[in-house]
Amino acid sequence: MKLIDSLLERNSARGLIEPFPNSDEMEKIYQAALRAPDHAKLKPARFIQISGQGLNKLSSVFYDFAKNELMIEDESILQKYKDAPFRAPMIIILVTKHQEHPKVPLIEQKLSTAASAQNILLALESYGYAGIWRTGKFSFDNKLLKYLNLDDNSTILGYLYVGTRDGDKKKISNYSVDEFVSVWE
């Protein structure tokens, strides 16, 4: 399959099962991630890869954070957060490590991490795997940083849930480019 065809067919996979990429595949996937646009070569993207028993640890982090920081008392909601990491056999937490630079503001560093995430999703597809980028309360609350042993110069941009697509890839129609593109000539 040509690269353009793969790009045109890519979509997020909600249902993910084993297998997930092995360490050799992940090495190449991360190399692809690090090829993302990066003003001044700051390499702000950081990745926390979680699988196996690590999912249990993340489950505890989510539960503790929801209970202690979000002040959630409803056990059914707490259980939902506790179960969240088990929706995929691997999770990659997307982190931007901020660095002071006179020409590269924080937003550019976050955008570089986001581009790295897209490269990861595309590289996963090239190996026959799939993923979905999830965000929410556990992405945008800086109080979670301490639960993940991250410093205050870090921002969580989301979580890539990774594995093998469970079921067929959904078919998505192409969009009319005219709705999104204006041309100046």
Tell where the protein language model's regions lie, with residue ranges.
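N-terminal amphipathic, basic helical "cap/leader" segment at the start of enzyme domains
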Residues: 1-87, 185
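Short, electropositive alpha-helical surface patch
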Residues: 144-155
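Small-aliphatic-rich amphipathic alpha-helix that forms the alpha element of a beta-alpha
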Residues: 33, 92, 98, 102-146
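C-terminal helix-cap and adjacent tail motif
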Residues: 3-12, 157-185
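A generic structural signal for well-ordered coil/turn residues at beta-strand boundaries
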Residues: 43-44, 88, 156, 177
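Short loop segments at secondary-structure junctions
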Residues: 52-54, 97-98, 164-167
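Acidic-glycine-rich active-site phosphate/pyrophosphate-binding loop
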Residues: 67, 86-99
